[in-house]
Structures are given as C-alpha cells and as structure tokens.
UniProtKB/Swiss-Prot annotation:
Sodium-ion dependent, high affinity carnitine transporter. Involved in the active cellular uptake of carnitine. Transports one sodium ion with one molecule of carnitine. Also transports organic cations such as tetraethylammonium (TEA) without the involvement of sodium. Relative uptake activity ratio of carnitine to TEA is 11.3. In intestinal epithelia, transports the quorum-sensing pentapeptide CSF (competence and sporulation factor) from B.subtilis which induces cytoprotective heat shock proteins contributing to intestinal homeostasis. Changing M179L: In CDSP; uncertain significance; reduces carnitine transport but the mutant retains more than 40% of wild-type activity. It comes from Homo sapiens (Human). Changing L95V: In CDSP; uncertain significance; reduces carnitine transport but the mutant retains 30% of wild-type activity. Changing G462V: In CDSP; reduces carnitine transport to less than 5% of wild-type. InterPro entries: MFS_dom, MFS_sugar_transport-like, MFS_trans_sf, Orgcat_transp/SVOP, S22A4/5, Sugar_transporter_CS. The gene is SLC22A5. The lineage of its organism: Eukaryota, Metazoa, Chordata, Craniata, Vertebrata. This is Organic cation/carnitine transporter 2.
Length: 557
C-alpha cells in the first residue's frame, strides 16, 4: 500500500503549481495580520478633558483653569475626568476674581465631566472611544472590546477544525474569509457600542477560522519539504506583513469608520483567489471523491509540465487510515500519569504566558513614547527576524535552551524598562522591541516543542489544550495594558516577571531535539528532576499505531 505522498511524488516539490499555492495561501493570511491588531487604532484613547459649554459665562482666565492638574509619569498634566465645579467658578468669574491670585484652586470643589469630553484630534479624528465616550467611568469598555474579540478567536478555534473536516478546507477558507471581511464592514454601521462588540466577536471567529483553514490546506497540498517552510515562515511572515500594513493605513486614515473601509478592501480582493486555490486532494480522498482529487492532480501536473500516469488514485491501493482500529482517548489522558500531568500543566502555563506577552506588547504600542504609527510598524517588523531565528533554532539547536533563551531575553529587557531615565524614551522603545522579538521567537517555537513532547495517541489533544490556554492569555492581555493607566511600568514588570519565571519553568521540560516522536504515553520523555513513578494507568495505556521516527520542524498554528 502507498500513502498520498508516495502516490503524488511525481509532481515534484517546488514546481509552478506548488509555488502558486504557497504564495496565494500565504497572501490570504495578510488580512489576518491587520484585522487581529486593528484595535490598536480603532480603540485608541486620545488625550481628553472635560468639556465646558460655550454658554458658560467664564472669563478667559477661568476658561484656562477649569480643569485641575494631576501627576502622571512624574509631571503635572490636566485631569482627564474631573473639572472644577462649574457653578462655583462661574460665580468667581462674575465677581472678577482671578484664579490662583484671588482663589486657591486647591480648595475648589470638583465634579465629573457632566457635559462630556473634548478629545484631541492631533493624532486621531475619531475612534470608537471618542464615538461613544469610553473614558473615565467607562474606560473599562475599551479593553473589554479587545478581550471579546479574542473570545471570538477562542470560539472560532473550537469550530474551525470540525467545519473544515465536514465541509472541506477550501469552502471553509472562503466562507470564513467572507465572514471576517463582511462583519468588519458591518462594524462601520454600528449604532452603538454593543453592536460594535457583537460584530467584533464574529470577526474574531472568522479571523482564526480562515487562518486555520489556509494553514491546513497548505500543509495538505504542498510536499513534505515545502510544507516545513510554509508552516514556519510562509504564513508567519505574511501575517507580519499584514501587521506592517496596518499602521500605514492608519497613518493616512485617521477616522475609524473610514479605516475599517480600507481594511476590508484586501479581503474583498481575496475573493478572486477562489479560481486559483483548489480543494485539498487529501480531504477529497478522505471523502471518497477520488475523481475530483484526480482532476486537481492532473491540473497540477500540467502546470508543472509533467506527464501524468494513466491512473493516479487506486482506491484499493491507498491507505485508509480511518479503517485502522484505534483505542479511544479523552482529555483526561493528559492528566493520567504524573509525567504527562506535569507536561500538560507546564505547557498550559508556558502558552498562556507567551500569549499574554505577545499580545500585551503588540497592544501597548500606543503607550510608547514617539510616533504611534512608527512604533506599531517597528513592532510588526521585528517579528520577521524573530520568525527566521526561530526556524534556524528549530533546525540546529536544542528546544529547551532555545525557548528559555528567547524567553529570558524577552522578559529581562522588560524588567529593565523601569530603570530607563524619562529623557531616554528611545531606549525604552528599543527595549520593548527587543522584548517583542524574544517573545515572538518563543511563540513560533512553542508549537513544535509542544507537539514533540506529547505522544501520537494524544498529540493533537495536547496541542489543542495548550492552544486554548494561549487564547485565554490573549483574552487577558488587554487588561495587562490597562494597568498602565495606574502605573506606566506595571504592565512591563508583570509581563517581564511572568516571562522569566516561564523561562525557568521551561528548563524542567524534557529535551526533544534529535529524538524520535513518542507514540505512547509510556514512551514520553521525563520531566527534569522527576523520578519515574509507576501508576496503574501505565498498564492501561496500549500502543496505538506506529509513526515513523522523525523530528518535527514545523509549527501548527
């Protein structure tokens, strides 16, 4: 019996057909790059202060002293959420009293912004924060909006695999791409905050679903060697390119509704890819649709200038993997023995911390000194060398030390942030970018490392649980950024400390580099410093299928 790769080996690895599929599927990821982090600009909070009605009878001196001062980052700035009691200062103005000279401003009664806010338009013409006044008592709604987007990502990650298994990779790719683009466009017509948030959740569901569908479609169509490059560099770098495009759009378009219009246009253009991207022949074969799969392979051979055998797929010859009797496993197997339990707990902590660091630093770019658009672009650009470095480390160096080094680098520079003098704000920006570099490299490597730790019988389940933990981390990340409103360095201290602790934790995980993939739970590598403990479940676990000893060198997002 021959498997799919052997049957289609005559196509070659890197012909015109494979190159087309590689670049088109990678290009379909570009909208995901700017959709996922568009909240950096859509939900930005400009400088603001309490509005004073034009009808208020105040002298020019009192109009310049309606807002009290407060300390922020060691300097006095106008308060964003309080003003002096308007009726009181109107009386002082009518009496001809001068602020500071005749009236002690420190003794004046204050009130909230009863007449709304005035928002600076130096950077943004409008955001959803200025649209619906998401400041002061309602400032918690801004991070909630971002968290709910990631809730949509979490929900989408649950259903995307099942949908593509049931309806096909190509169908799910384009339907969810349309879902992401369509609901993003509908956000333009949001009448209130609640409508915007509900649509944002649906955008998040579509965003992760088409990402997963494109990833699976590419890994199933492309050959073994190209598959590695596609999964480690192709989708990641094109995602980063989409992220880099985001600040470019936002620089020229300062209104949030018009920015959304611009961000949905590339998604509309992706519709044309329908006529160039085929369905996965592997999936068609799994559905018994051999003739359709053969048509696709013949077109691929024609594009590559290769003579096609008279018969490509012989149903009796292909391995029917689904016919193999398999022992069922459930999520409790990830906790069955002491060793796999420790690997699972440590993997969950690792993934969650890395996700908090990656998205926390990405969302924090508006709070850095300097130009927000340049900072966002740098945050995106630094991901490209991080992905390349991660790929090289996966090829040649041990996993544990590579992961720990990347995390130590990312965490330590974040802790140094509080030591940077205020006048060296460019150094602070450099440190944040170095931290983002380290965390991004670790994020890219953790997929491979986790997959290598778990045995074949529960590998998919183990990576799935870990990936879910990363989604939970992304949901929490906006609130780490939110803490910066109370202490500028608190987010960096928390993220840096967690990242360093996770780096230390990584050193206790087994080293999988250069070792065959385990097939059964008994074959798993042992957690460092832990003695082997026999449990009754060892005898219950039976070997469940064979997998050729190999080393994983690709990520599976």
């Amino acid at each position: 019996m021959r498997d799919y790769d052997e049957v289609t080996a005559f196509l070659g690895e890197w012909g015109p057909f494979q190159r087309l599929i590689f670049f088109l599927l990678s290009a379909s990821i570009i909208p995901n790059g700017f959709t996922g982090l568009s909240s950096v600009f859509l939900i930005a909070t400009p400088e603001h202060r309490c509005r004073v009605p034009d009808a208020a009878n105040l002298s020019s001196a009192w109009r310049n002293h309606t807002v009290p001062l407060r300390l922020r980052d060691g300097r006095e700035v106008p308060h964003s959420c309080r003003r002096y009691r308007l009726a009181t200062i109107a009386n002082f103005s009518a009496l001809g009293l001068e602020p500071g000279r005749d009236v002690d401003l420190g003794q004046l009664e204050q009130e909230s912004c009863l007449d709304g806010w005035e928002f600076s338009q130096d950077v943004y013409l409008s955001t959803i924060v200025t649209e619906w006044n998401l400041v002061c008592e309602d400032d918690w709604k801004a991070p909630l909006t971002i968290s709910l987007f990631f809730v949509g990502v979490l929900l989408g990650s649950f259903i995307s695999g099942q949908l593509s298994d049931r309806f096909g990779r190509k169908n799910v790719l384009f339907v969810t791409m349309g879902m992401q683009t369509g609901f993003s466009f509908l956000q333009i017509f949001s009448k209130n905050f609640e409508m915007f948030v509900v649509l944002f959740v649906l955008v998040g569901m579509g965003q992760i679903s088409n990402y997963v569908a494109a990833f699976v479609l590419g890994t199933e169509i492309l050959g073994k060697s190209v598959r590695i490059i596609f999964s480690t560099l192709g989708v990641c770098i094109f995602y980063a390119f989409g992220y880099m495009v985001l600040p470019l759009f936002a620089y020229f378009i300062r209104d949030w509704r018009m920015l959304l219009v611009a961000l949905t246009m590339p998604g509309v253009l992706c519709v044309a890819l329908w006529w160039f991207i085929p369905e996965s022949p592997r999936w068609l074969i799994s559905q018994g649709r051999f003739e359709e799969a053969e048509v696709i392979i013949r077109k691929a051979a024609k594009a590559n200038g290769i003579v096609v055998p008279s018969t490509i797929f012989d149903p009796s010859e292909l391995q029917d993997l689904s016919s193999k009797k398999q022992q069922s496993h459930n999520i409790l197997d990830l906790l069955r023995t002491w060793n796999i339990r420790m690997v699972t707990i440590m993997s969950i902590m690792l993934w969650m911390t890395i996700s908090v660091g990656y998205f926390g630093l990405s969302l924090d770019t508006p709070n850095l000194h300097g130009d927000i658009f340049v900072n966002c672009f740098l945050s995106a650009m630094v991901e490209v060398p991080a992905y390349v470095l991660a790929w090289l480390l996966l090829q040649y160096l041990p996993r544990r030390y590579s992961m720990a080094t990347a995390l130590f680098l990312g965490g330590s520079v974040l802790l140094f942030m509080q030591l940077v003098p205020p006048d060296l704000y460019y150094l602070a920006t450099v440190l944040v970018m170095v931290g983002k570099f380290g965390v991004t490299a670790a994020f890219s490597m953790v997929y491979v490392y986790t997959a290598e730790l778990y045995p074949t019988v529960v590998r998919n389940m183990g990576v799935g649980v870990s990936s879910t933990a990363s989604r939970l981390g992304s949901i929490l990340s906006p609130y780490f950024v939110y803490l910066g409103a109370y202490d500028r360095f608190l987010p960096y201290i928390l993220m840096g400390s967690l990242t360093i602790l996770t780096a230390i934790l990584t050193l206790f995980l087994p080293e999988s580099f250069g070792t065959p993939l385990p097939d059964t739970i008994d074959q798993m590598l042992r957690v460092k410093g832990m003695k082997h403990r026999k449990t009754p479940s060892h005898t219950r676990m039976l070997k469940d299928g064979q997998e050729r000893p190999t080393i994983l060198k690709s990520t599976a997002f």
